[in-house]
């Protein structure tokens, strides 16, 4: 039974973070309040940067999926990368027994290849070429299906085709001169004999026949197109009259002749046309021009050329103004886009400055608490020394040591306050710099009266100004003025961004140095605690 159980000695309970914070506050040590909330002015730009952040990966073309975490790490995908092309499972040209063969995705479907499509026309299109096949019926002679002697329908007993009623076959039991009823839709004219050669216009080797194995046509009768009426072979008198050329108009010799133009009447006297002139007829036309006429004609021609040149200049001016309007619009659009990008960049720099300020404040707090930890470690080491080592204070130097300790604490506190004020000043300077650059100060009063000034300046470039021309001049002047304003704001944004980047670089460097120093101090305190026995 140990002394701890005998005397009921138990280790103290471990303090919670809230209890430690209260103890540090009671001793006058600075702590961080978890309930305090600092308002951030550029938090929206932080959200914007997080939403537009992209994870850039570097991988060869086609392997981007393996660069992202969790993608391409499956076992099957890894095995597929290590699988050889000669493995049994990857050979695509061979198929197992009982499984259908896969279709080649790179095969070309040729409609003109008779062996590409398995149709009824190809006797070799079956999947099993050595299986038992049904015999193919073939016609005997070449003219079995398309003979001209079987296409003319003649009444029984008429003096028509003498071979129409023949039943003699050509080795197959089929009449090669059999009538084709589908080819004779209209009966022949009464009292006339049908032309036995009327159907010779049809090609017996057309697409109605199908070639068989032996080179002859396969016995597959295809209905032929109906031929026109036989009566159309002998045109009717009315049709012949209609086809006759139109008759030429012939003058009626019995009609009364009426003069078409009284002025050109040949029966009039030669003096009738000169009556009333009294010897004063029209002036004869001269074959030359006077100097005044030539000068007048030259002036008119010169005036027309000048008018054409003026019109051409007007068109060029109009085209140039329209091009200038479009150019100023595009320039203003690009300038506004550049300004928006600069404002977003500067806003994100402001959000970064606020985050750096939080890091600096936390580092300052860590410095203060680490100094307290150093004092506590030294006190713990003194209390944990040998019981025989008696420590007796020097009464002659005790007051001096107390004054030195108080002075040291006061100086340290002043140094901490100055460092805290410097951190706050840097944040305020960064915020004011960014706010001044982001503020868009537009003078509405100036924009209200600039129309009259723009039109007054544009008068020397106009010579026939209308409402549309005034609008173009005003838009050009307004766009140029806006481009100048945007350029000034862009310059201000660029200067502010450069100053902010320089300031943040120095702050980041100082944070890095403080973090390294803090790491060394914490490691040193940990080593001291480990050496205490």
Swiss-Prot record:
Residues 92-102 have a biased composition (Polar residues). Keywords: Coiled coil, Protein transport, Repeat, Transport. Belongs to the SNAP-25 family. Residues 227-240 have a biased composition (Low complexity). Residues 1-32, 68-184, 200-246, 259-284 are annotated as: Disordered. SMART domains: t_SNARE. InterPro entries: T_SNARE_dom (IPR000727). This is Protein transport protein SEC9. Residues 11-24 have a biased composition (Basic and acidic residues). GO terms for cellular component: plasma membrane; SNARE complex. GO terms for molecular function: SNAP receptor activity; syntaxin binding. Residues 318-380, 470-532 form the t-SNARE coiled-coil homology domain. Residues 157-172 have a biased composition (Gly residues). GO terms for biological process: exocytosis; protein transport; SNARE complex assembly; vesicle fusion.
